[in-house]
Amino acid sequence: MRLIVVSGHSGAGKSVALRVLEDLGYYCVDNLPVNLLDAFVQSVSESKQNVAVSIDIRNIPKKLKELNTTLEKLKAELDVTVLFLDANKETLLTRYSETRRIHPLSLDSQSLSLDQAIELEQEILMPLKAHADLVLNSSGQSLHDLSETVRMRVEGRERKDLVMVFESFGFKYGLPSDADYVFDVRFLPNPHWEPALRPLTGLDGPIGAFLEQHQSVLDLKYQIESFIETWLPLLEKNNRSYLTVAIGCTGGKHRSVYLTQKIGEFFADKGHQVQIRHTSLEKNVKE
């Protein structure tokens, strides 16, 4: 039996993750109190069915040590994965504004504003996030994108495959929090300064044609691919479930998008499990 414990920030997508796991054949339980986790697992262990449980901030003990002790005990007996759903404050504020729901911590203390509740929850959950096996950042992702991310990561972990995630971003929006490697490509020639190219993105042919005229772009693409290829065997031997490579330019529209797409396709063509995301483009589409 395999157990996935789903936790994370309220509004970051725990319910979405649980629905995906249910579709993958997991027996799912929402908002299970931590003190019942061990007994629940023992009660279903003979069924041999994979199980997923979500733990809400209100069900986490005040002393996280109690939760860690329970998880360590279960890990000694079962194949246990802790999946943590993360999102930045801007995304969480937007989601709560759209759904008009009340944050769980605000229910317990009506003196807390939404902003304060989010910050308090981040502080409480920090140790749990640090010990999670999978951390997924849902900032700016649609329900479909998040569902696909969860599915790929979980299925990849079940097959013991390394899932390679390539994401482009804009430095003006901040660094991605889930990246293992970050490449800054702001020194490359910028199509933004060509009026005819400015409205396009790195996914468009004319942008690719412009960038491929410059040897520096081709050299950097080759060097990033070579760097990852060199160390990939050791990363796979280290029992990693996923590798996230972030490539950033100023706005996340042209240079980083082009390189992320091409490098992701390079590794996909070699048979690796690859997911490609363009975070700033997704953000701009929503805006």
Curated annotation (Swiss-Prot):
Pfam families reported for this sequence: PapZ_C, RapZ-like_N
Binding-site residues for ATP, renumbered to this chain: G8, H9, S10, G11, A12, G13, K14, S15
Listed InterPro entries: P-loop_NTPase, RapZ-like, RapZ-like_N, RapZ_C
Binding site for GTP: D56, I57, R58, N59
Membrane-crossing residue ranges in chain numbering: none
Keywords annotated in UniProt: ATP-binding, GTP-binding, Nucleotide-binding
An annotated Gene Ontology molecular function: ATP binding
Keyword Nucleotide-binding among record annotations: yes
Similarity comment: Belongs to the RapZ-like family.
Role this protein plays: Displays ATPase and GTPase activities.
HAMAP family: RapZ_like
PANTHER family hit by this protein: RNASE ADAPTER PROTEIN RAPZ (PTHR30448:SF0)
Protein name (Swiss-Prot/TrEMBL): Nucleotide-binding protein VIBHAR_03667
The organism of origin for this protein: Vibrio campbellii (strain ATCC BAA-1116)
